[in-house]
Amino acid sequence: MDNIINNQGNNNIIIQSVTDSSITLEVNGVPQEIQNELATLHALMDQLNAQQVQMADTIYDLSQIGQADLGIKKTFNVFLTKQLMMALADNGLAPAQKFLAKVQAKKDWENHSRFTDVAKNLITFAFVGVIGIQLRKIMAIGKEPLSERKQQTYIKNCYAVAVNAVQLINFSLLSTFWDALQNKEYILTEEESKVIAAFFEDRIQWDLLSHVELLQQLLALFQRYTIDLPLKELHQIDIKRLNKISGRIQKLNDLLERSQNTLITCFEIEGQLTQLLKQLILLANYKMLSVKNIAYNEHRATPPKYIHSYIELGIDQKFNENTERINILGMPVVTDAVILHHKHQNHAQNINLSPFVIDYNTQMLEKGAKICFFSSKHISDGSLNYCFLEDNSIENIVFSDMLQKYNIEDLMKDRDRYIRFKFDLIHIQFEEAKQLILKNSFQGEDNIDLDDLFS
């Protein structure tokens, strides 16, 4: 080529031609052919410490290559899969370490389905409960034929995983702070009061940045009073970087909301979600359970036992989803609860996520799991809106005040009344948590009150 421009980095990479199957390059004057895949080109550039490539007379930065119409193929999930496998291995996950050791000689393993299918299963198994299930969905969408619908659902689901990952950490912090307040009083700052009160009272569903702001305030609160963190690895989070990543994810999702998204938006949000999950890799250290029932069992001359019936949320070692299990322990745990516990600890040592996370099926006395995260209060009557994570639909829970209408014996005998009573208990827990957490809050006057819209 007559017109060669010196690129930034230690090496010059010039794209000579692009075919359906390959990219022909000139690397420092030496011809080279690689697979036609954006991830493969990125890997080569990373290996050579090159920040740019040249095609004809134009220089493209790393961020521009994916956006330019160069005929380079772009495959969903490639970046996500490779980066998360490396992060999980660094976090100590033995199966990820073994996998990477086995494929070490295969430099482009992330472009071969016989390797990536195994890696994707390991990733979904590693991440806690509902996050692993949602990652499986993202990977399934990535395999679908390219369409406008695929692009939209991919962006939506990447955004949902980011939101739910931050929410899960916030719920663990709120629950732990609620427990801490049983024995000691803590004073909230003005900003903490404002953000936490908004969490309990807002009639509008929060976006990702709002959840990150709550996380920032809760971490500051725990640090100021030296309260033990519920997830010990939380001190490793770089909150400034998490804020920056979340801001990018929010902007990319906003493009979808305005119907301004393109194919490139999918790859950009996949990259940012990957960075967010690497920040929150601690979520691979925990498990989620939905406790369905506890049965007391004691025989003559034998110690008492508690038979725990629960659903292990997420993907198990055989890659089944939401597996029902039974365990026998010498102590009870809270029933009708979704709990979080460290993988290397007994589930009797847990964080009770209720009423912020509920299993709707448990409340309805139905089999299986239907996990819902608290979303907002209803705009008209202040009832509780919960988001069903499978499809982001809203389950509204009203307060029926059943104990004022019936005695407990009558409630237990009637299935419908008992179900409504169980939902009442969620309301009661939610209000108890709000009242205690905000008991010593700063009373500001700038909250937007939407209570009287329908009065």
Predicted regions and their residues:
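Histidine-centered catalytic/metal-binding microenvironments
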Residues: 253-272
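Feature for intrinsically disordered/low-complexity regulatory segments and propeptides
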Residues: 65-248, 267-288, 298-319, 415-419, ...
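Long, low-complexity intrinsically disordered regions enriched in small/polar
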Residues: 1-60, 64
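Long C-terminal appendages of very large multidomain proteins
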Residues: 297-455
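Intrinsically disordered, low-complexity segments used for protein-protein interactions
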Residues: 25-27, 32, 36-43, 74, ...
